[in-house]
């Protein structure tokens, strides 16, 4: 029996039968339908793992990554103790903004993925705003 994505998300809320990874995948796909990056306003995509955080600015119409940054980058890794903190996420946002302004990208669409806008995701967004990106 096949269900639509919306029905599966509702089932998750009602009886908690979906596995967490499947739920994240469905949530990501449902958000992806709403958020698209264009050459004028590319998409800032965020991935958060337990140890690190990764961010990239993507032009979806041409399927190209324009700018990327993570806590594994050498210059950021030297300035932080670990990639799990909000301070590290804020540095990632500021560096991403700096790199994107060099490529004349000022307006973006923020794609938080399946993650809540809280903690490290919010810190990254605040750092990008402080760096000069508008979203």
Curated annotation (Swiss-Prot):
Classification via InterPro entries: Ribosomal_uL18_bac-type, Ribosomal_uL18_bac/euk
Primary location class: plastid
Keyword annotations: Chloroplast, Plastid, Ribonucleoprotein, Ribosomal protein, RNA-binding, rRNA-binding
Localization per Swiss-Prot or TrEMBL: Plastid, Chloroplast
One GO term (biological process): translation
One CC-aspect GO term: chloroplast
Record GO terms (molecular function): 5S rRNA binding; structural constituent of ribosome
A Pfam family reported for this protein in Swiss-Prot or TrEMBL: Ribosomal_L18p
Role of this protein: Binds 5S rRNA, forms part of the central protuberance of the 50S subunit.
Family in the record: Belongs to the universal ribosomal protein uL18 family.
Protein name, UniProt field: Large ribosomal subunit protein uL18c
Organism per entry: Trieres chinensis (Marine centric diatom)
Lineage: Eukaryota, Sar, Stramenopiles, Ochrophyta, Bacillariophyta
Gene: rpl18
